[in-house]
Amino acid sequence: HSITIRNKRLIKLVNQCEEIPGWELFNYFEKGEKHRIDSSMVNDYIHQLSGYNFSAKDFRTWAASKIFFESLSELPAPKTTKEKDKNLLYGIDQAAQALGNTRNVCRAYYIHPTLIESYEDTILSQYFEKYKTTEESTDFTSSEKVLLELYAKYEIRLDSAKPF
């Protein structure tokens, strides 16, 4: 599924949302009355707009993965395991900072696992090359196009899946 949101204010709000049902995001006044907006309302709105069961967390996951990918693409290819680990932390930190999360939370819950695995296995470097030569479209940036291609090849391995 894919949807496009071009409203910058909505994108900013979605990126600030937490997956805590009913978490109050902000209040506003209209005609002298106070109205509250909570995360459930934002998630309902996203569902209504898209027609799919998306939530703010889906957008945060997409954003974190995109930031992680783009951050790593700017770095030179690592020559050692130590450099690879340092680069991974850099990419995770960039995504965590953008989302306002810790490194551990971002890695565990927001960055798509295939990105980290692919970087560790040096597979991601071929996608960095595609990213540099892929043209943007009206619907997707070049990094988003490449990420979708990578995700299409992703398979969940039940033997290594983490329990909830």
Each language-model region and where it sits:
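Extended accessory and catalytic-adjacent subdomains in large enzymes
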Residues: 1-156, 163
